[in-house]
Curated annotation (Swiss-Prot):
Annotated positions for site Transition state stabilizer: K99
Entry keywords, A to Z: Cytoplasm, DNA damage, DNA recombination, DNA repair, Endonuclease, Hydrolase, Magnesium, Metal-binding, Nuclease
Organism expressing this protein natively: Streptococcus pyogenes serotype M1
GO BP annotation list: chromosome segregation; DNA recombination; DNA repair
Similarity section: Belongs to the RecU family.
Alphabetical list of InterPro entries matching this protein: Resolv_RecU, Restrct_endonuc-II-like, tRNA_endonuc-like_dom_sf
Gene3D superfamilies assigned: 3.40.1350.10
Keyword Nuclease included in the entry's annotation: yes
Its biological purpose: Endonuclease that resolves Holliday junction intermediates in genetic recombination. Cleaves mobile four-strand junctions by introducing symmetrical nicks in paired strands. Promotes annealing of linear ssDNA with homologous dsDNA. Required for DNA repair, homologous recombination and chromosome segregation.
Entry EC no(s): 3.1.21.10
Cofactors named for this entry: Mg(2+)
UniProt protein name: Holliday junction resolvase RecU
Catalytic activity as recorded in UniProt: Endonucleolytic cleavage at a junction such as a reciprocal single-stranded crossover between two homologous DNA duplexes (Holliday junction)
């Protein structure tokens, strides 16, 4: 329909509003992005070499709608992944997992799997530095929890309970978010485990 005198086309306004979808699969992406930016900062300054581990996937079916555009339509995890990140800092092997929750009082232990706990125990046995970064998004607080504290709590009831934030505060270290790096977890490693400053 043309609107005289301006010859504008009137657009229909839909009375149905779009519902906001919550994508639970990507809840931790902003925290993960902050860790990735931190690792990029450490790498660019030659402080540490730490990378996110790729998840091993077996591709089963691929569609080729066009020769230049392959689309994966079916894939499966080939094996259970261990932890999210690994690398080297001052000659020390570093291995850690990152978890995020919206809860204010506890970190759900269902976020941790037995194969991850076993992997962390193996890293500790080889004298590696192993820990978890726990982010409470509602509180805007992040903690560095040594793997041994996580393993000890997990062994109490095979990971069926939630880990209270009081336990995390007592056994871990609060990570102060910054601009560069955003999640300065190497400060905690240096000050509490290696006895110095990473700069």
């Amino acid at each position: 329909m043309v609107n005289y005198p301006h010859n504008l086309i009137r657009q229909k306004v839909s009375s149905v509003q779009k519902q906001n979808k919550v994508d639970f699969a990507n809840r931790g992406m902003s925290f993960e992005a902050a860790i990735n930016a931190t690792n990029d900062y450490y790498l660019s300054r030659q402080i540490a070499v730490i990378h996110k581990k790729p998840t091993p996937v077996q591709i089963v079916k691929v569609d080729y709608p066009k020769r230049s555009r392959a689309k994966i339509v079916e894939a499966y995890f080939r094996q259970a992944s261990t932890t999210d990140y690994c690398g080297v800092y001052k000659g020390h092997y570093v291995d850690f997992e990152a978890k995020e929750t919206r809860q204010k009082t506890a970190m759900p232990m269902k976020n941790f799997h037995l194969h991850q706990i076993e992997h962390m125990a193996c890293v500790l046995h080889q004298k590696g530095i192993c820990f978890v970064l726990l982010h409470f998004s509602t509180l805007k607080e992040t903690y560095y929890l040594p793997a041994q504290a996580l393993i000890s709590f997990y062994q109490i009831d095979n990971g069926s309970k939630s880990m209270p934030i009081d336990y995390i505060r007592k056994n871990g270290f609060k990570v102060a978010f910054g601009a560069f790096p955003q999640v300065p977890y190497l400060n905690i490693i240096e000050q509490n485990f290696l006895g110095g400053d990473y700069n």
